[in-house]
């Protein structure tokens, strides 16, 4: 059996569709015949149901995955308040330890063929005084998929994020254009610009451009993503 594949999903900002795209990728991987699991290592914002604390993003990932990870592996750190993780963690007396997440990821890799790891917020969200989500991606050593929320300002946000990813020595396996503003003028032109710049500067292909959906359907969106292109990039980036 080949070694499991894994990727780190980040975004140009918060609330731009990382969970939606991650769930769509999970559907695509499952359709490709892979055992697909998801991690949301740090989740901020919880609700209680049946005596257990849950998170809506994690619920969406669970619904899309065809391999269910134990909650403690899927989300090692579930914070109650929906705010910046390092602030909430400090108030709740929780240390967001990257080593704990790396260990959970190692265990997840024993259970599935491909693991989608969804970050929190953008690429550089503080987890502690001196560590952020970029440090987490480096510790995991994973190729990155960038979700670009297509709205005014997205070109600069995407290029800056791609630079930050490259500066940490991580491969940008591809990016997804997610149309979060259905009224945005020249959306296709923005996507075309990013396609050219990210390909030229980072050799990062566009994996798909997702139409605005209301309500969102990750399963439907998965058909617009080139999962095989991504799988080839992940295999090329995997340790030999």
Swiss-Prot record:
Protein known as: ATP-dependent dethiobiotin synthetase BioD
Database matches in Gene3D superfamilies: P-loop containing nucleotide triphosphate hydrolases
EC number: 6.3.3.3
Encoding gene (name): bioD
Database matches in NCBIfam families: bioD (TIGR00347)
Classification via PANTHER family: DETHIOBIOTIN SYNTHETASE (PTHR43210:SF5)
Keywords assigned: ATP-binding, Biotin biosynthesis, Cytoplasm, Ligase, Magnesium, Metal-binding, Nucleotide-binding
Any matching Pfam family: AAA_26
Entry binding sites for ATP: 15-20, 57, 118-121, 178-179
Catalytic activity from the UniProt record: (7R,8S)-7,8-diammoniononanoate + CO2 + ATP = (4R,5S)-dethiobiotin + ADP + phosphate + 3 H(+)
InterPro entries given in the database record: DTB_synth_BioD (IPR004472), P-loop_NTPase (IPR027417)
Swiss-Prot/TrEMBL cofactor(s): Mg(2+)
Matching SUPFAM superfamilies: P-loop containing nucleoside triphosphate hydrolases
Active site: 40
Pathway named in the protein's UniProt entry: Cofactor biosynthesis; biotin biosynthesis; biotin from 7,8-diaminononanoate: step 1/2
Assembly notes: Homodimer.
Binding residue positions for Mg(2+): 19, 57, 118
GO biological process: biotin biosynthetic process
Subcellular location field: Cytoplasm
Domain of life: Bacteria
Assigned protein family: Belongs to the dethiobiotin synthetase family.
